């Protein structure tokens, strides 16, 4: 890896050339970036992106990828002449029940900081890898809670104008694992998150608990509120059993987490599925239909934990959680896409339901 000091060219940010991206992502796949620019402050993020976007408009810059934790992205092997801006601004401030986290802050550290101040609302989102800035993009959720439940506003850099402004949550079109900020192509982001503000509960209690597996672990009833630290501990234990807490020594955690979102279908599709399988189909109410459990669909379609079962396969389903596509060592983005297509097409052939990917796919497609 070559490093160089470019002075004020990129607002004082750290610049390196010929950088392998695989070690910077939780899936551990990706090409070698021509240039990696690491921004440790918000001013650097803004200055670097303004510079690169000006160059791109003049045809003087190749593709630009912006990311922080690298936990929800699959980067194609063949991307050439790629410039990567790594967002590493990480200040977290707490004022009363308001928590403000810069985009590069490690998400789980934000959760811990809130709990240590007696604030509830984020504990069910414990253990999720990645950065604070990624949470509104994806509308991150787990165990019955979504981050949009507590986001008040997001500070954005508009890539087309270079302007920075706070945007209220109501203008972000939050939905299930999506928002107006999410783009199918991670190279075409119209706006970049700089900071996120959350309004939490200062009563010392968690968000209402509604996820059956979690309430059972805590010995509580649905709708009850627990002590945030206890809820966090239970969530981390559940995630660890599913290989959803990062561990460099455990290849089941070399993933982007759940690769497919839970599909939302019309009620008649759910009824057809129940009749087809003759089973009690896990399902949840959704605003625009019925939400099904993607992991259940995978396993019933023949894609169980550890699929395809070949110990030499470089990419396999996790041995702990069928929804996670994992790198067993030496896998490429192409290997991941082959397995993802096999699973997606197999579920569609059996049930007539097409699963959609949860991570952002950059330079690759299903």
Curated annotation (Swiss-Prot):
<comment type="pathway">
    <text>Cell wall biogenesis; peptidoglycan biosynthesis.</text>
</comment>
<dbReference type="GO" id="GO:0008762">
    <property type="term" value="F:UDP-N-acetylmuramate dehydrogenase activity"/>
</dbReference>
<feature type="active site">
    <location>
        <position position="358"/>
    </location>
</feature>
<keyword id="KW-0274">FAD</keyword>
<dbReference type="Pfam" id="PF02873">
    <property type="entry name" value="MurB_C"/>
</dbReference>
<feature type="active site">
    <location>
        <position position="177"/>
    </location>
</feature>
<keyword id="KW-0131">Cell cycle</keyword>
<dbReference type="InterPro" id="IPR016169">
    <property type="entry name" value="FAD-bd_PCMH_sub2"/>
</dbReference>
<keyword id="KW-0133">Cell shape</keyword>
<feature type="domain" description="FAD-binding PCMH-type">
    <location>
        <begin position="29"/>
        <end position="203"/>
    </location>
</feature>
<dbReference type="InterPro" id="IPR036318">
    <property type="entry name" value="FAD-bd_PCMH-like_sf"/>
</dbReference>
<keyword id="KW-0132">Cell division</keyword>
<keyword id="KW-0285">Flavoprotein</keyword>
<comment type="function">
    <text>Cell wall formation.</text>
</comment>
<dbReference type="GO" id="GO:0009252">
    <property type="term" value="P:peptidoglycan biosynthetic process"/>
</dbReference>
<dbReference type="GO" id="GO:0005829">
    <property type="term" value="C:cytosol"/>
</dbReference>
<keyword id="KW-0573">Peptidoglycan synthesis</keyword>
<dbReference type="InterPro" id="IPR011601">
    <property type="entry name" value="MurB_C"/>
</dbReference>
<dbReference type="InterPro" id="IPR006094">
    <property type="entry name" value="Oxid_FAD_bind_N"/>
</dbReference>
<dbReference type="GO" id="GO:0071949">
    <property type="term" value="F:FAD binding"/>
</dbReference>
<protein>
    <recommendedName>
        <fullName>UDP-N-acetylenolpyruvoylglucosamine reductase</fullName>
        <ecNumber>1.3.1.98</ecNumber>
    </recommendedName>
</protein>
<dbReference type="InterPro" id="IPR036635">
    <property type="entry name" value="MurB_C_sf"/>
</dbReference>
<keyword id="KW-0521">NADP</keyword>
<dbReference type="InterPro" id="IPR003170">
    <property type="entry name" value="MurB"/>
</dbReference>
<comment type="similarity">
    <text>Belongs to the MurB family.</text>
</comment>
<dbReference type="GO" id="GO:0008360">
    <property type="term" value="P:regulation of cell shape"/>
</dbReference>
<dbReference type="Pfam" id="PF01565">
    <property type="entry name" value="FAD_binding_4"/>
</dbReference>
<keyword id="KW-0560">Oxidoreductase</keyword>
<dbReference type="InterPro" id="IPR016166">
    <property type="entry name" value="FAD-bd_PCMH"/>
</dbReference>
<keyword id="KW-0961">Cell wall biogenesis/degradation</keyword>
<keyword id="KW-0963">Cytoplasm</keyword>
<dbReference type="GO" id="GO:0051301">
    <property type="term" value="P:cell division"/>
</dbReference>
<dbReference type="GO" id="GO:0071555">
    <property type="term" value="P:cell wall organization"/>
</dbReference>
<feature type="active site" description="Proton donor">
    <location>
        <position position="258"/>
    </location>
</feature>
<dbReference type="InterPro" id="IPR016167">
    <property type="entry name" value="FAD-bd_PCMH_sub1"/>
</dbReference>
């Amino acid at each position: 890896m070559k490093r160089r000091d470019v002075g004020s060219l990129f607002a004082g940010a750290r610049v390196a050339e010929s950088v392998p991206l695989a070690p910077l992502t939780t899936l551990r796949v990706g090409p070698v970036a021509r240039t990696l620019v690491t921004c440790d402050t918000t001013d650097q993020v803004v200055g670097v992106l303004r510079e690169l976007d000006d160059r791109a408009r003049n045809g003087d810059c190749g593709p630009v990828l912006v990311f922080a934790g690298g936990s929800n992205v699959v980067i194609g092997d063949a991307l050439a002449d790629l410039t990567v801006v790594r967002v590493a601004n990480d200040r977290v401030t707490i004022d009363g029940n308001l928590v403000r986290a810069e985009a590069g802050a490690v998400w789980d550290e934000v959760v811990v900081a809130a709990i240590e101040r007696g604030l509830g609302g984020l504990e069910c989102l414990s253990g999720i890898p990645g950065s604070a800035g990624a949470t509104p993009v994806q509308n991150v959720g787990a165990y019955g809670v979504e981050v949009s439940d507590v986001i008040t506003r997001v500070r954005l850099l508009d890539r087309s104008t270079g302007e920075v402004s706070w945007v209220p949550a109501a203008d972000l079109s939050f939905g299930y694992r999506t928002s107006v900020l999410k783009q199918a192509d991670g190279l075409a982001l119209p706006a970049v998150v700089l900071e996120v503000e959350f309004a939490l509960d200062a009563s010392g209690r968690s968000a209402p608990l509604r996820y059956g597996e979690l309430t059972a672990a805590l010995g509580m009833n649905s709708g009850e509120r627990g002590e945030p630290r206890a809820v966090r501990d239970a969530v981390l234990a559940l995630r660890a059993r599913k290989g959803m807490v990062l561990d460099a020594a455990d290849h089941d955690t070399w993933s982007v987490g759940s690769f497919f979102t839970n599909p939302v279908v019309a009620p008649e599709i759910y009824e057809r599925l129940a009749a087809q399988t003759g089973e009690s189909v896990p399902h949840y109410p959704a605003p625009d239909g019925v939400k099904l459990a993607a992991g259940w669909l995978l396993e019933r379609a023949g894609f169980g934990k550890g699929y395809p079962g070949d110990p030499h396969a470089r990419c396999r389903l996790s041995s702990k959680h069928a929804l996670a596509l994992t790198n067993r060592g030496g896998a490429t983005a192409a290997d991941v896409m082959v397995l993802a297509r096999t699973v997606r097409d197999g579920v569609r052939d059996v049930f007539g339901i097409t699963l959609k990917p949860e991570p952002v796919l950059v330079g690759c497609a299903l």
